[in-house]
């Protein structure tokens, strides 16, 4: 044995493989205020104890690897390692456990959602000792969240920019999502905004295709916004999708939107990536643009109950990375979303301080220390009959977005917008008068339809449309 080997051996190095739980399962550990905490739903392979599975997650998402290594002796593992500090069974699920893991703050680069996710979920999800793994929640300590800018502006600043208070905002996604020329697209934008909507929207996959290049779309939409504003006296906007193949091209599109004088741009934050999103959010704050976020691809990550990542984690990540709006499901429409779960992450988007509440899927108390809030956007398969429920569920600080529920009106786009605006104003007035929208909502809509032919026609066309499927994402 060489002197060098003897020296290493003398300080305790022993080659080989040992159980993760001997190092990374520490039930006696007291979490620190500066720790990032994670709740993982763990499904171990048969024969793997839950303590070993939880410790493996902590190890592989922090300092560990499959064998002991010489260089462990060159640093302080106790300072840098993740620790599985608690494990509890999942009620009603065989061989599933919630493993709680604490990560020291020094493991993560400041202001980088990209680095945070690369560490915590970047590699461990393919680990063979686990049949499945899902990240249910994260606790972001103030000492880390304060390293992020967060949303470019936030809810209150947006309301001040738009001069709109006391009600949800109304939007519409232009349909068909693909195939329209830029001029016809701009026409639809104008008609919807003139009819009473606050916003219209590019669909998530509208970027710069052969049938409609981005610059042409931006110009025609800006013209539509200006014309609708002049006719209605209200501030209007269209979510111009700046998502592109490179960050440089994305910023170029945002710069052109600013030069046109429009109030808001849009980004697909999951397909575009967190680094691109944070870059765009910084540009938007510096240049007075609101930022609408679409969550395209989220269901690939969050829909399965035992594997992936819950949307509440993606919502927290977006609040740190930056966005003024984000799509959040509807509860009542065509897209996935159970009520208590949805309201849990809606609060995580909007509020400053959110208490732990397992009945709504919130595993940790979260303190955002005055980071601006994000408006949830309810969009997907909704129409005028849903308006009372949406107003009651989401409250004023939200965007209610009707695509087919506007453009599918039998009389055209502008009447469809009128119908939605009348329905919303009726629901807000009824709520302010103390009426119970959950119980009296349909009657409120019927009463309003007596005074609005556009609303009456919408009520007739969509009276039988429902999306009654059980939610997959249940507590």
Swiss-Prot record:
<keyword id="KW-0560">Oxidoreductase</keyword>
<dbReference type="GO" id="GO:0004497">
    <property type="term" value="F:monooxygenase activity"/>
</dbReference>
<feature type="binding site">
    <location>
        <position position="295"/>
    </location>
    <ligand>
        <name>substrate</name>
    </ligand>
</feature>
<protein>
    <recommendedName>
        <fullName>Ribulose bisphosphate carboxylase large chain</fullName>
        <ecNumber>4.1.1.39</ecNumber>
    </recommendedName>
</protein>
<feature type="modified residue" description="N6-carboxylysine">
    <location>
        <position position="201"/>
    </location>
</feature>
<feature type="binding site">
    <location>
        <position position="204"/>
    </location>
    <ligand>
        <name>Mg(2+)</name>
    </ligand>
</feature>
<dbReference type="InterPro" id="IPR000685">
    <property type="entry name" value="RuBisCO_lsu_C"/>
</dbReference>
<feature type="binding site" description="via carbamate group">
    <location>
        <position position="201"/>
    </location>
    <ligand>
        <name>Mg(2+)</name>
    </ligand>
</feature>
<dbReference type="GO" id="GO:0009507">
    <property type="term" value="C:chloroplast"/>
</dbReference>
<feature type="site" description="Transition state stabilizer">
    <location>
        <position position="334"/>
    </location>
</feature>
<dbReference type="InterPro" id="IPR036376">
    <property type="entry name" value="RuBisCO_lsu_C_sf"/>
</dbReference>
<dbReference type="InterPro" id="IPR020878">
    <property type="entry name" value="RuBisCo_large_chain_AS"/>
</dbReference>
<dbReference type="Pfam" id="PF02788">
    <property type="entry name" value="RuBisCO_large_N"/>
</dbReference>
<feature type="binding site">
    <location>
        <position position="173"/>
    </location>
    <ligand>
        <name>substrate</name>
    </ligand>
</feature>
<dbReference type="Pfam" id="PF00016">
    <property type="entry name" value="RuBisCO_large"/>
</dbReference>
<comment type="subunit">
    <text>Heterohexadecamer of 8 large chains and 8 small chains; disulfide-linked. The disulfide link is formed within the large subunit homodimers.</text>
</comment>
<dbReference type="GO" id="GO:0016984">
    <property type="term" value="F:ribulose-bisphosphate carboxylase activity"/>
</dbReference>
<keyword id="KW-1015">Disulfide bond</keyword>
<keyword id="KW-0503">Monooxygenase</keyword>
<keyword id="KW-0113">Calvin cycle</keyword>
<keyword id="KW-0460">Magnesium</keyword>
<feature type="binding site">
    <location>
        <position position="327"/>
    </location>
    <ligand>
        <name>substrate</name>
    </ligand>
</feature>
<keyword id="KW-0934">Plastid</keyword>
<feature type="binding site">
    <location>
        <position position="203"/>
    </location>
    <ligand>
        <name>Mg(2+)</name>
    </ligand>
</feature>
<feature type="modified residue" description="N-acetylproline">
    <location>
        <position position="3"/>
    </location>
</feature>
<feature type="binding site">
    <location>
        <position position="379"/>
    </location>
    <ligand>
        <name>substrate</name>
    </ligand>
</feature>
<comment type="function">
    <text>RuBisCO catalyzes two reactions: the carboxylation of D-ribulose 1,5-bisphosphate, the primary event in carbon dioxide fixation, as well as the oxidative fragmentation of the pentose substrate in the photorespiration process. Both reactions occur simultaneously and in competition at the same active site.</text>
</comment>
<feature type="active site" description="Proton acceptor">
    <location>
        <position position="294"/>
    </location>
</feature>
<dbReference type="GO" id="GO:0000287">
    <property type="term" value="F:magnesium ion binding"/>
</dbReference>
<feature type="modified residue" description="N6,N6,N6-trimethyllysine">
    <location>
        <position position="14"/>
    </location>
</feature>
<dbReference type="InterPro" id="IPR033966">
    <property type="entry name" value="RuBisCO"/>
</dbReference>
<feature type="active site" description="Proton acceptor">
    <location>
        <position position="175"/>
    </location>
</feature>
<comment type="similarity">
    <text>Belongs to the RuBisCO large chain family. Type I subfamily.</text>
</comment>
<dbReference type="GO" id="GO:0009853">
    <property type="term" value="P:photorespiration"/>
</dbReference>
<feature type="binding site" description="in homodimeric partner">
    <location>
        <position position="123"/>
    </location>
    <ligand>
        <name>substrate</name>
    </ligand>
</feature>
<feature type="binding site">
    <location>
        <position position="177"/>
    </location>
    <ligand>
        <name>substrate</name>
    </ligand>
</feature>
<keyword id="KW-0602">Photosynthesis</keyword>
<keyword id="KW-0120">Carbon dioxide fixation</keyword>
<keyword id="KW-0150">Chloroplast</keyword>
<dbReference type="GO" id="GO:0019253">
    <property type="term" value="P:reductive pentose-phosphate cycle"/>
</dbReference>
<keyword id="KW-0488">Methylation</keyword>
<keyword id="KW-0007">Acetylation</keyword>
């Amino acid at each position: 044995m060489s002197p060098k080997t003897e020296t290493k051996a003398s300080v305790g190095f022993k080659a080989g493989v040992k159980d993760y739980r001997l190092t990374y399962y520490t039930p006696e550990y007291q979490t620190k205020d500066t720790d990032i905490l994670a709740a993982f739903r763990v499904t171990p392979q048969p024969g793997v104890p839950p303590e070993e599975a939880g410790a493996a997650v902590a190890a592989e998402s922090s300092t560990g690897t499959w064998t002991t290594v010489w260089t462990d002796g060159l640093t302080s593992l106790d300072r840098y390692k993740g620790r599985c500090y608690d494990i509890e069974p999942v009620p009603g699920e065989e061989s599933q456990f919630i493993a709680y893991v604490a990560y020291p703050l020094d493991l993560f680069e400041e202001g980088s959602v990209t680095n945070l996710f690369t560490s915590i979920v970047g590699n461990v999800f393919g680990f063979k000792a686990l049949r499945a793994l899902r990240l249910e929640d994260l606790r972001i300590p103030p000492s880390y969240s304060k390293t992020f800018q967060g949303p470019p502006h936030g809810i209150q600043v947006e309301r001040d920019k738009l001069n709109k208070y006391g009600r949800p905002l109304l939007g519409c996604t232009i349909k068909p999502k693909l195939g329209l020329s830029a001029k016809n697209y701009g026409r639809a934008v104008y008609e919807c905004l003139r009819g009473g909507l606050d916003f219209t929207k590019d669909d998530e996959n509208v970027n710069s295709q052969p049938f409609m290049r981005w610059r042409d779309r931006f110009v025609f939409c800006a013209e539509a916004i200006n014309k609708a504003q002049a006719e209605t006296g209200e501030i209007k906007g269209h979510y111009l999708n700046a998502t592109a193949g490179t960050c440089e091209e994305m910023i170029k599109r945002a710069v052109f939107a600013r030069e046109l004088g429009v109030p808001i741009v849009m980004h697909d934050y999951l397909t575009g990536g967190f680094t691109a999103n944070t870059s765009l959010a910084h540009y938007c704050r510096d240049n007075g643009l609101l930022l609408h976020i679409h969550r395209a691809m989220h269901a690939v990550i969050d829909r399965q109950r035992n594997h992936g990542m819950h949307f509440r984690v993606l919502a927290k990540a977006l609040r740190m990375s930056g966005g003024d709006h984000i799509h959040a499901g509807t509860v009542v429409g065509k897209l996935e979303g159970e009520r208590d779960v949805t309201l849990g992450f809606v609060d995580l988007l909007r509020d400053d301080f959110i208490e732990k509440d397992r009945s709504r899927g919130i595993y940790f108390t979260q303190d955002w220390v005055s980071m601006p809030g994000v408006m949830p956007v309810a969009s997907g398969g909704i129409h005028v009959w849903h308006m009372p429920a949406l107003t009651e569920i989401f409250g004023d600080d939200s965007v209610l977005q009707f695509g087919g529920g506007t453009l599918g009106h039998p009389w055209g786009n502008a009447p469809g917008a009128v119908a939605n605006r009348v329905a919303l104003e009726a629901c807000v007035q009824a709520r302010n008068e103390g009426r119970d929208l959950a119980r009296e909502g349909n009657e409120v809509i019927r009463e309003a339809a007596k005074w609005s032919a556009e609303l009456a026609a919408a009520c007739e066309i969509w009276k039988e449309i429902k999306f009654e499927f059980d939610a997959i994402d249940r507590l």
